[in-house]
Amino acid sequence: MLKPSEDYYELLDSYKELHKEEGKFRGISLVPLVPTLINVIKENNCKTLLDYGCGKAIPYSKKECKSIGLKKPVQELCNLDSFDLYDPAYPKYNKLSKKKYDIVVCTDVMEHIAEQDIDWVLKDILSHSKKTVFLNISCQPALKHFKEGKFKGQNVHVSVFHGTWWSDKVKNIWNKFKHLKIYMVCVGKDYTHVDCIKKEKV
């Protein structure tokens, strides 16, 4: 069984420190993807959702969602029956349920994970889904850098790879979760790589 590396915990501590700054990791990378997410949820008849790596989860806040351009919070726009939020670096949401959900959403997360931890994190994400997974991954450096700790001075996107690399990585993990349909949107400096990984109809 794959386990978190020392770097995982080092990075987690660094992200916890960055989270203390009010404007950091608000979860707003989800906002431009909401129309796509709504379509994915409708297409797969998803009624329950887990946002894995939700940050401060502003898109789900009834009070704050309008300040980031959403008319309603995500759970209402997507007509969900229930949803849960998880982010190990933010105390309010640092408890991960053992439940399974119709869809697991993971945006702006994987590029923050050290390469040696990518496999077990992906496996954890997929293991919480009954039907569908929606992944959004940045394939370019971020504007933020770590201010302290082992990774001081380094870019917070510690795993920057091409979208095709990510597709191959996810497909390898998906081989043990072939009942799932996985949607991927990987965004590089001058390209967008879109993929849908699913079992082929016979």
Enumerate the predicted regions with their spans:
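Short N-terminal helix/helix-N-cap motif within the alpha/beta-hydrolase-1
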Residues: 114-118
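Conserved N-terminal segment of class I S-adenosyl-L-methionine
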Residues: 1-101, 119-122, 128, 139, ...
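Short glycine-centered segments of the SAM/dcSAM-binding site in methyltransferase folds
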Residues: 131-134
